Design a protein with these regions (language model features):
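Glycine-biased flexible loop/turn sites that connect beta-strands or occur in inter-domain linkers
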Residues: 20-21
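Local cysteine-cluster metal-coordination motifs and their immediate loop/turn environment
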Residues: 62-78, 95-100
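Mobile, glycine- and charge-enriched loop segments
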Residues: 41-65, 159-161, 165-176
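Short beta->alpha transition motifs characteristic of CBS
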Residues: 25-31
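Zinc-dependent deaminase
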Residues: 1-3, 78-176
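A short, polar/charged loop-to-alpha-helix boundary motif
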Residues: 31-45
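Short, flexible loop/turn motifs enriched in small residues
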Residues: 6-10
């Protein structure tokens, strides 16, 4: 809420200990301070600024939304071997009116097959399991086991997104 009230997008992340799922750091987008401080990147920054911290491979990386290309790279370069998210790229675009993740992944990374002008329809935008990390979409399990909680979270993020959308363009954020 504080980040959105400051003019930032609705994304956030937390880094937890794998051993007990306790929170090590949590962060929200802070693009008004620096356009690179996406929730995940800001969490990584805070994690490595700690005087001591567990090895990234001993952590769970939790994202409110599926990471963009910047954050995917940050997670890989930082040594986190996993991340989980609740809202997908499609959710960000369709439910929260923030389409840039899909647009950038398609424009920059989606290399078309030689026999077509664009990438194959429905092709994943990144390798969800690769040499660097494995990603997990939490929504199917959350929706099945905690439908009321998911509905409340979706409503909260829709409200925060509406607040952000009403104010976007008044700050100094690229791709607002």
């Amino acid at each position: 809420r504080t980040g959105v009230a400051s003019g930032n997008k609705i994304f956030g992340a937390a880094i937890l200990r794998k051993s007990d799922l306790s929170v090590i750091v949590a962060a929200a987008n802070d693009e008004t301070a620096n356009p690179l401080w996406h929730g995940e990147i800001h969490a990584i920054k805070k994690f490595f600024e700690l005087p001591s911290h567990p090895a990234p491979a001993d952590c769970v990386f939790l994202c409110t939304h599926e990471p963009c290309s910047l954050c995917l790279s940050g997670i890989a370069w930082s040594g986190f071997d996993n991340f989980s998210y609740l809202f997908s790229h499609a959710d960000s675009a369709m439910s929260f009116a923030i389409p840039y993740d899909i647009a950038i992944l398609n424009a920059v990374y989606a290399v078309p097959d030689p026999d077509r002008s664009g990438p194959a329809p429905g092709r994943d935008l990144y390798n969800r399991s690769n040499d660097y990390f494995t990603s997990t979409n939490l929504m199917p399990v959350a929706r099945a086991q905690l439908p009321d909680t998911v509905d409340r979270l979706h409503a909260l993020y829709a409200e925060l997104s509406a607040q952000y959308q009403a104010r976007k363009g008044t700050g100094n954020i690229a791709m607002a």
